[in-house]
C-alpha cells in the first residue's frame, strides 16, 4: 500500500436496489474527496469514484456500481484517502488511527498497547491491552496521559492509583 494513504472509514454491506452501500467514517468532520481507494482481492489499491454520499443515512454510491450485485463486490472494505487530505490538527490533537497500536509506557517501562478508543461517553477512554494480558480503560486526559509521540509511536502515562490492580 502507498505510504501516504490512510484508512479513514469502512464500506459495509449493500442497501437497496441501486448499488448503494452502507458506510462509516472514522474521522470526524471529514468530507470525502471524489476519488477514494479500497484494496481488491489481491490486496492492490483500486481507485473508486464517488457518485453520491448521504452522511446522515450512512450511504455511499460509486460510479459504475449500479446494482446490489456489483456493489457487493466492494463491500466490507476499508476506505483509504491520501493523508494530506486530512484536516490539520492542533497541538495535542490526534487522529484515532495514530493512537491505535501505540506502545504505552509507565515510568519508561512498556506496559501495553492502545487497542482502541472509546469516545461514546462524555470523555474519551483509551482501551489498553496490557502486557499482563488484561485490558484496562484509561481516561484520555492530561492528568493520566503525560506525553504522546506519534513519530515514535509511544505514549507515557501516569495512571490513577490502583489502576494496575483492576
UniProtKB/Swiss-Prot annotation:
Recorded GO CC terms: cytoplasm; ribosome
Localization per record: Cytoplasm
Entry GO MF terms: ribosome binding
Protein biosynthesis recorded as keyword: no
Main location: cytoplasm
Residues in PRC barrel domain copies: 91-163
Pfam families (UniProt xref): PRC_RimM (PF24986), RimM (PF01782)
Gene Ontology process terms (BP): ribosomal small subunit biogenesis; rRNA processing
Domain of life (superkingdom): Bacteria
UniProt keyword terms in alphabetical order: Chaperone, Cytoplasm, Ribosome biogenesis, rRNA processing
Gene3D superfamilies: PRC-barrel domain, RimM
The protein's role, per its UniProt record: An accessory protein needed during the final step in the assembly of 30S ribosomal subunit, possibly for assembly of the head region. Essential for efficient processing of 16S rRNA. May be needed both before and after RbfA during the maturation of 16S rRNA. It has affinity for free ribosomal 30S subunits but not for 70S ribosomes.
NCBIfam families in the record: 16S_RimM
Family: Belongs to the RimM family.
Domain comment, as recorded: The PRC barrel domain binds ribosomal protein uS19.
Assembly notes: Binds ribosomal protein uS19.
Name under which the protein is recorded: Ribosome maturation factor RimM
Name of the gene this protein is made from: rimM
